[in-house]
Amino acid sequence: MHSHNVAKPAMYGRHWATAGAVSLLSLVFVLNGCAVGPDFVKPEADIHENWSEKDDSRVATKTAVDSQWWRAFNDPTFDKLIKLAYQQNLPLQITGLRILEARARLGIAIGRQFPQQQDIFGSATKVGVSENGANKAFLNQDFSDYQVGFDAVWELDFWGKFRRDVQAAHASLIASEADYDDALVSLTAEVALTYTVIRTLEERIELTRENVKLQEEGLKIAESRFSNGITTELDVTQARALLESTRASIPTLQSGLRQAQNALSTLLGQPPGAIQTLLDGQNGIPTAPEEVAISVPAELLRRRPDIRSAELSAAAQCARIGIAKADLYPAFSLFGEIGFQSSNNGGVQSNNAHFDNLFDASSFFYSFGPQVQWQFFNYGRIENNVRVQDARFQQLIVNYKNTVLRAAQESEDALIGFLKAQEATAFVQNSVHAAHRSVEIALVQYREGAVDYQRVLDTQRALLQEEIRLTDTRSSIATNLIALYKALGGGWELRQGQPVISESMQAEMRKRTYWGRLLPPPSPKPENLSPVPVRDIPVLKKPYW
């Protein structure tokens, strides 16, 4: 409860307080560029100028990655799935909401630049005084006290603490935007990979069924020769064993296919089975182009969202070192209080004071002036907090460098995988042609009695094995190209000009909470991807209401 039973300050005291407050406030604005703590400098990254496979004729260099790289596969179903995933994927929507959360946190940081305490207060108190208490002769035994007013305390940003807080919050905001882009890159790649798995399993099931027909033909030949007494029953049992083994692989493949379809449904924000009509038709394994155009390795530093996020997270933590260091210095504040008070607790002569004269001119009071607070004796708490923040910053610097190295590795691995899968596919295709011919020859020779049935079994097994290898290597071409585009940071441009939160979700949120101008959140812009230097942050930044 506020109590104001002291005399009003003398004139010279008011002048001193006013002059001190104005001088202190003026000094803070003059020292706008003053901020303790280190300024963030982008870490050096060890990355080569060119790819290891730069001399391969299938690799072309260009300044940017295709923003819609999946269209290179010329598969309309592919395009539809990517679009639906962008619109409906639930984890991506969560990442978009984190951008909104980060914008609100930036608003909190900006709000701290203004008076940190601004309270309207009021009270009406009835007090009964003990007749046996001290000073009872000077107080009414029963008295009332009424007061209402406004007070404020403004800690001035003398050491840049609040500007560093804004700087950290802004870096965290654009880091959350980079995280959204990274989630979008991962989503497009995951949809593409899952779709490729589905088409690969469909083809393997079809190949297995064709081999079942071929093995059924071999079984009929063995049964005919056995019934005519030409061979023993062993040929029949061997043929039947291979046939049943091949048939048994189909349910396993079908199970894997259904699981992949369910995984794709989840990526599209749909329950299992809901996207089956989209997958109808035999589009086959996505066919990748023979050549690929990619940017130089240094472009990774700009394009890969996870690298941008790592850099911005380090920038935010660098600003937090300054916030911690500011606590080592005295905090300068301005305080002020105005209000009205009416009380009859000053003795027997004050019985006429009551609520009716609360707002009389004689009931007005005020106080204001500068103040200083310094946590001088803190037993190492503040200094160790600075050390904690610095250690976290160094961790993020190392994490940034590791992210760059990992990005380079992923790109190189995917590129070499794509090129070598193409070469392997050409060899396996020749092997499949030879395996088909071997089966034909073995069956003819078996009918003629030139070879036993074991030779037929061996050629049929080899054919199935080589056809599966061909399917897998063709799939590997597509999956390695998808991995390459993901490693290069391709696909996040899909969100440009689009809201990161759907209109229906915005409407749902507005029903619960007043969001002001934070909704709808603007789409992140490429020119807003760098941390803001503290010197560019004003002492008073326009607040988010």
Segments predicted by a language model, with ranges:
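Short, conserved phosphate-binding/catalytic loop or strand-edge motifs used
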Residues: 126, 218, 233-240
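Amphipathic alpha-helical coiled-coil segments
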Residues: 95-109, 183, 187-210, 214-217, ...
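Bacterial N-terminal signal peptides that target proteins for export
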Residues: 3-23
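Small/polar-residue-enriched beta-strand and adjacent coil segments characteristic
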Residues: 36-43, 67-68, 74-84, 88, ...
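Amphipathic alpha-helical interface segments used for oligomerization, scaffolding
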Residues: 225-231, 249-252
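Terminal intrinsically disordered/low-complexity segments used for targeting and assembly
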Residues: 2-3, 19-21, 29-87, 146, ...
